[in-house]
Amino acid sequence: MIRPQTRLKVADNTGAKEIMCIRLLGGSNRKYSNVGDIIVASVKSATPGGVVKKGEVVKAVIVRTKKGIARKDGTYIRFDDNAAVIIRDDKQPRGTRIFGPVARELRDKDFMKIISLAPEVL
């Protein structure tokens, strides 16, 4: 469950280390977002020489959350951190590598490039 002002780790190699959610896309009065949802975020910390700079406003897709995700077979999956991948307007990732596992729910939301780059899909 990600809401505005939530800080997330960045799970790609764009140079950003941490982002803060500014806005949840997909509804005017939306309170929370989960895995596979797109958010607008501000880069709070970044490495020198990266693709994105500190203070830049970016779009990102949530790939991991601490809140459990209920699946249709009755199981839950939950991760150790909240993480996102920075994307372009055409839903393609800006980075060329993804770090850490990602949730299988991204496949339903048509983020196939992120699924293929991820080292593990849970």
Swiss-Prot record:
The keyword Secreted does not apply. The gene is rplN. It comes from the Bacteria. One of its GO terms (cellular component) is cytosolic large ribosomal subunit. This is Large ribosomal subunit protein uL14. It comes from Caldanaerobacter subterraneus subsp. tengcongensis (strain DSM 15242 / JCM 11007 / NBRC 100824 / MB4) (Thermoanaerobacter tengcongensis). Gene3D superfamilies: Ribosomal protein L14. Part of the 50S ribosomal subunit. Forms a cluster with proteins L3 and L19. In the 70S ribosome, L14 and L19 interact and together make contacts with the 16S rRNA in bridges B5 and B8. The lineage of its organism: Bacteria, Bacillati, Bacillota, Clostridia, Thermoanaerobacterales. InterPro entries: Ribosomal_uL14, Ribosomal_uL14_bac-type, Ribosomal_uL14_CS, Ribosomal_uL14_sf. GO terms for molecular function: large ribosomal subunit rRNA binding; structural constituent of ribosome. Belongs to the universal ribosomal protein uL14 family. Keywords: Ribonucleoprotein, Ribosomal protein, RNA-binding, rRNA-binding. It holds the Pfam family Ribosomal_L14. PROSITE patterns: RIBOSOMAL_L14. One of its GO terms (biological process) is translation. Binds to 23S rRNA. Forms part of two intersubunit bridges in the 70S ribosome.
